[in-house]
Amino acid sequence: MSNQLIYTGKAKDIYSTEDENVIKSVYKDQATMLNGARKETIKGKGVLNNQISSLIFEKLNAAGVATHFIERISDTEQLNKKVTIIPLEVVLRNVTAGSFSKRFGVEEGLDLKTPIVEFYYKNDDLDDPFINDEHVKFLDIANDEQIAYIKEETRRINELLKDWFEQIGLRLIDFKLEFGFDKDGKIILADEFSPDNCRLWDAEGHHMDKDVFRRDLGSLTDVYEVVLEKLQGLK
């Protein structure tokens, strides 16, 4: 049956469609932190995230990155290829910030000589623990070849994103990606890309991402609107 709720997430609800290989993602006006411990409804956030993520994924598709994105069909909805999500949060860091700075006792804002890729086990009950390649294999999440591909693809995506954000005066600090297996067993980029799952700083070091919500720095939607407007000006 179509339009049946498949999954309710922190920022999106997922529905079935008439095509068994296609799902509908509906973006919500909800901001969360501490793995959902703090929740707040922020009017307009869903529309902005859908627009930003759709724009980024369209550009990634055009650049030859295999993604789940098909098309945006309304202000808050988009169609995606159905995937089996790999239970990994793949984090790439260009600059020290957030939990990385806390974990290693270093100040925020230090450029990393080489971008660092980290894995976190997607498990709410365990609070998404930081894991390494050996843990990934032990948990039977991915094999050596798949791990290498995910890392390589994440680094390739990073180079594209860094260039695009640099063109609009924003510094890409870090971001989180999720991947999944499509119907043919191919690993493709899934989930979303928005200021919800990346850190962006402007030339003055102002936060242009969900840290505005996490750190009570002002209006989240005002910041997201600026990011969207800048992205819409990309050539």
Swiss-Prot record:
GO terms for MF: ATP binding; phosphoribosylaminoimidazolesuccinocarboxamide synthase activity
Gene Ontology annotations of biological process type: 'de novo' IMP biosynthetic process; cobalamin biosynthetic process
Pathway: Purine metabolism; IMP biosynthesis via de novo pathway; 5-amino-1-(5-phospho-D-ribosyl)imidazole-4-carboxamide from 5-amino-1-(5-phospho-D-ribosyl)imidazole-4-carboxylate: step 1/2
Keyword Transmembrane helix applies: no
The UniProt record lists the keyword Nucleotide-binding: yes
Catalytic activity, EC: 6.3.2.6
Catalytic reaction equation(s): 5-amino-1-(5-phospho-D-ribosyl)imidazole-4-carboxylate + L-aspartate + ATP = (2S)-2-[5-amino-1-(5-phospho-beta-D-ribosyl)imidazole-4-carboxamido]succinate + ADP + phosphate + 2 H(+)
Keywords for this protein: ATP-binding, Ligase, Nucleotide-binding, Purine biosynthesis
Similarity section: Belongs to the SAICAR synthetase family.
NCBIfam families on file: purC
The name this protein goes by in its record: Phosphoribosylaminoimidazole-succinocarboxamide synthase
Gene designation: purC
